[in-house]
Amino acid sequence: IDNVLSRKSSWFVSYPINSYNVTLYIGDYIHFSDVLVRENDTLSLDYYVLSYNKEKAQNHFNQVKPMLECFEKYFGPYPFLNDGYALIESSYLGMEHQSAIAYGNNYLPGYNGNTNYTADLDFDFIIVHETGHEWWGNSITSNDIADMWVHEGFCTYSEVLYVECMYGYQKMLEYVNNQKNRVRNDKAVICDFHVNCKGSSDMYSKGSLMLNTLRNVINNDSLWFAGIKGLATQKKHSTLDGVEVINYFNRFFNLDLSKIFEQYLSHKDIPEFEYKFQKKGRSYSLIYRWNAINDFDMPLIFNVGINEKRIFPSSDWQELSLGSFDKKDFVIRDDLLFINIKKT
């Protein structure tokens, strides 16, 4: 090769890395950089974009630093400090290549301009989702593709927490409930182990909605966020099985959440809350049960007016006296729980 026309570049990765996270980019790139100053150190931010997109990229990538600050709030420090954070313009939409994220969202909001993915919020979906993978998928990696929900469920949930951090709690609720539109319930999320089997693509949105459901089951946000950050920091730079994640949750929250994980991950259907009203004089009783797997154990949240209540259905019919009230004031909080509702 004519040395005048060739150039050799050497790159070093100082952390464990999955084989699929290694990539090669070749293009007419220009480089610009920034830093994220933190309490005890500085994270380098490097951007490689096609030369004619420099000005556009410099403006568009302003969203990176506040996003990283949100993720560090919930998941702990960026897990690849020594290698830095980078976005590299690519010919495809995106991929979570470790410390060298492929970016091809055309400097548009949403998913290549489609803000249905972002519940009409104007952030860049690819930047946020692929960056979430630095914690979920790159730092913490499943041992088997059958447990890929650990990557995609937690990463898709990272979008939800980003929205809460940047836009507030109510926008977060709108965002996470918008994810229901992408759930098909076609087959189980967890697939057969040791045979290179990947489960339903529902692992993305259903995984996120399951985690939001668990947050409301726990019903203690400071404890919930401590548990999420603890998982991200204690298991960083390691591989694990999905059952280890479930066991961690059970220990940390001192609850047996196994049946909730089983319902959402090992079966295609989500739990169904079945109910009816029975009138006795001027009073009403609520007759209710779960249609779910055996021994399914999860509270049901509902409001009567401004009062929030929790009940613990089983597969058997149960009865709760509600007294005299207007049935229009009865609201099942399926914005907090990912469930189906059947009124009989």
Residues of each region from the PLM?
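Active-site-adjacent structural elements in folded domains
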Residues: 88, 117-122, 190-199, 212, ...
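Acidic/His/Gly-enriched intrinsically disordered linker/tail segments
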Residues: 148, 152-210, 235
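Beta-strand-rich binding/interaction modules
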Residues: 257-258, 273, 277-335
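Hydrophobic helix-coil surface modules that form long, contiguous segments used
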Residues: 1-128
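Amphipathic alpha-helical substructures
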Residues: 79, 200-281, 286
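Zinc-dependent metallopeptidase catalytic helix centered on the HExxH motif
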Residues: 65, 70, 104, 109-173, ...
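Active-site-adjacent bridging/hinge elements
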Residues: 39-44, 128-134, 177-192
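Intrinsically disordered, low-complexity linkers and stems that provide flexible hinges
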Residues: 1-29, 33, 308-344
